[in-house]
């Protein structure tokens, strides 16, 4: 194995809990009630697919543009006053991978400006050779496009890359791409079928680093 491709939200950073708070706030403001539960339904999906899920759930009860504006207003205000919450073991696994000369990429469904801002805020941007974001590919997770493109830019076949994911849609994308897929659960817990499909389920990124070391 020569490459490692990381999801971002819920995997490297505890950003999904911030989105739960944001959508509870937005739902209350728009009169539809707390909508943080929608985070589970849209885990790993890009902005356009997320909008589609909101349309399917709420129909004409809320204005799509207003939901987007208020969401990012809340998120921007949060990160203006707080650092991005880093997941346990992130720096450790990145140091481990760099020490063994792995090529490392991000494959996140979030927009490019958000991904780059979070990586810089956490002071880990220097670890990544490639950054792939949701607005760089035509098809969102669970389609495998973003993982295939990340591996291509790393100049590696997907079979030579680990993929690290926390969401169902992300896991489906990584598995379909041919990456050796490791799950680190966050808000969504895998069923027995998914557990059998992935290479490993690890409680955190420290445990994932131990798994990689044993998988040589």
Q: What do these predicted ranges mean?
A:
Residues 1-40:
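Active-site neighborhood of HAD-like aspartate-dependent phosphohydrolases
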Residues 1-2, 95-98, 111-216:
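Asp-based, Mg2+/Mn2+-dependent phosphohydrolase catalytic module
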Residues 29, 33, 54-92, 100:
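Metal-dependent phosphoesterase signature
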């Amino acid at each position: 194995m020569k490459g490692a491709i990381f999801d971002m939200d819920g995997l490297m950073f505890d950003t999904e809990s911030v989105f739960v708070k944001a959508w509870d706030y937005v739902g209350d403001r728009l009169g539809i009630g707390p909508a943080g539960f929608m985070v589970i339904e849209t885990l790993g999906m890009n902005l356009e697919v997320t909008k589609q899920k909101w349309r399917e759930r709420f129909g004409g009860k809320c204005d799509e543009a207003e939901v987007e504006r208020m969401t990012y207003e809340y998120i921007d205000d949060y990160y203006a006053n707080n650092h991005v919450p880093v997941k346990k073991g992130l720096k450790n696994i990145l140091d481990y991978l760099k020490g063994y000369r792995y090529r490392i990429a991000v494959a996140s469904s979030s927009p490019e400006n958000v991904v780059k801002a979070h990586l810089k805020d956490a002071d880990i941007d220097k670890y990544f050779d490639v950054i792939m974001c949701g607005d760089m590919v035509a098809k969102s997770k669970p389609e495998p496009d973003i993982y295939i493109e990340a591996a291509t830019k790393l100049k590696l076949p997907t079979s030579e890359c680990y993929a690290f994911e926390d969401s169902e849609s992300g896991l489906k994308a990584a598995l379909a791409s041919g990456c050796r897929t490791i799950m680190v659960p966050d808000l969504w817990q895998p069923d027995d079928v998914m557990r059998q499909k992935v290479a490993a389920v690890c409680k955190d990124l420290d445990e994932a680093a131990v798994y990689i070391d044993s998988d040589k």
